[in-house]
Amino acid sequence: MSTQRLRNEDYHDYSSTDVSPEESPSEGLGSFSPGSYQRLGENSSMTWFQTLIHLLKGNIGTGLLGLPLAVKNAGLLLGPLSLLVIGIVAVHCMGILVKCAHHLCRRLNKPFLDYGDTVMYGLECSPSTWIRNHSHWGRRIVDFFLVVTQLGFCCVYFVFLADNFKQVIEAANGTTTNCNNNETVILTPTMDSRLYMLTFLPFLVLLSFIRNLRILSIFSLLANISMFVSLIMIYQFIVQRIPDPSHLPLVAPWKTYPLFFGTAIFAFEGIGVVLPLENKMKDSQKFPLILYLGMAIITVLYISLGSLGYLQFGADIKGSITLNLPNCWLYQSVKLLYSIGIFFTYALQFYVAAEIIIPAIVSRVPERFELVVDLSARTAMVCVTCVLAVLIPRLDLVISLVGSVSSSALALIIPPLLEVTTYYGEGISPLTITKDALISILGFVGFVVGTYESLWELIQPSHSDSSTNSTSAFI
């Protein structure tokens, strides 16, 4: 993020921010008052609408279409209630992160802080001398989890794009205009899905060259529109002629609940884009309202799609609800529209990881080589995500494992602990400490359960073909 500019003063042009420190308000940081929350380059900051678009795009698309199966694993009653609780807790943790960042900015006279810096400075407020002396590890840990999570999402997107386009093309000869019957068709074999991934590679590389969030908001808007249209088509189908739900269990067997929990935590992990968006917003005081509005929309979407999808297809629900739709061109287009949305989402997910890794690389080269090194590093990172998608068998489970570890840590474990360390020296109520401890324990349970389930699936060769990449658990 732009905070990296403060760490690497000799590196002038890498950031997505259009305004350099020399172009910032003439008062500089010396006029930064404790009661205000200013930022450099305010004239080039995003509007509230652009911020909302980015927030929706950063959350919708990750695990959304797998939520009906998640509700099945929890039960018709317990599933939606659990999604609501997890959504509330996740949004609360996002609010904690923003609150702590604001508080530390006022205390330290900083214009803005990213996630890693917020944790680092929060640990410096700890009553423990050992923690204060090792506070820099807080930033390193957060940056590591952010990079793993965001690049993991990017790997999944490669597989998602390849699998969906491959399915549409291979079923083209058998696809009809009759959407009343869900008929099984014989697929016409085409090239391997890995070749589809390589086909998308140059286009995603070009997309990753966009380093300005205001420009990315245009692509986010396109992604939101395409996903919005595809979701309307899905809703239009699943609300028709809903079967009698009396045979569906209100509470599923407890042995399948861990599968629900891991999927839900994965779906609600959007905390990585919160501070980057808040730091770029022109009027940051309005960000909490945008955050709660956007996450309320997302939570309602998650609960409704998960519940209605399970009600419509019952025990036959598949890993992606699109696999249950009729084989006609109308619903085949859902895959294409959603794939377009995922394509543009790649840029936003990639942005977070790039702004952590690239500044450290570019700051070590002469100024005349900065742009070349920047673009080369972006190209290499995109190629790495593509190579991982091509080479790693059962990529869905590998990403599930990474997501369970990173998402639980970033979304549920770290923010409550950050609140305790940040406010401990100023007096924090026992009730708040208890609340934060319970949330962190919940996140740790998600970490343990998600990791266990992913590892268990990875060592079970009979569950599916280990040589086939799949995103069925996520799309």
From Swiss-Prot:
Residues 1-15 have a biased composition (Basic and acidic residues). It catalyses: glycine(in) + H(+)(in) = glycine(out) + H(+)(out); L-proline(out) + H(+)(out) = L-proline(in) + H(+)(in); D-proline(out) + H(+)(out) = D-proline(in) + H(+)(in); L-alanine(in) + H(+)(in) = L-alanine(out) + H(+)(out). Signal peptide: none annotated. The keyword NAD does not apply. It is a multi-pass membrane protein. Disulfide bonds join C179-C328. GO terms for cellular component: apical plasma membrane; endoplasmic reticulum; lysosomal membrane; lysosome; plasma membrane; vacuolar membrane. It comes from Rattus norvegicus (Rat). Belongs to the amino acid/polyamine transporter 2 family. It comes from the Eukaryota. Residues 1-32 are annotated as: Disordered. This is Proton-coupled amino acid transporter 1. Keywords: Amino-acid transport, Cell membrane, Disulfide bond, Glycoprotein, Lysosome, Membrane, Symport, Transmembrane, Transmembrane helix, Transport. Electrogenic proton/amino acid symporter with selectivity for small apolar L-amino acids, their D-enantiomers and selected amino acid derivatives such as 4-aminobutanoate/GABA. May be involved in the efflux from the lysosomal compartment of neutral amino acids resulting from proteolysis. May play a role in specifying sites for exocytosis in neurons. Its main location: membrane. Glycans are attached at N173, N182, N469. Widely expressed and predominantly expressed in brain. Within the brain, expression restricted to neurons and not detected in glial cells. Abundant in regions rich in neurons using glutamate and GABA such as Purkinje cells in the cerebellum and pyramidal cells in the hippocampus. One of its GO terms (molecular function) is L-proline transmembrane transporter activity. The gene is Slc36a1. Pfam families: Aa_trans. It is found in: Cell membrane; Apical cell membrane; Lysosome membrane. GO terms for biological process: alanine transport; amino acid import across plasma membrane; glycine transport; L-alanine transport; neutral amino acid transport; proline transmembrane transport; proline transport; proton transmembrane transport. Residues 72-77, 162-189, 236-256, 310-341, 393-396, 460-475 are extracellular. The keyword Iron does not apply. Residues 1-50, 99-140, 211-214, 278-288, 363-371, 418-438 are cytoplasmic.
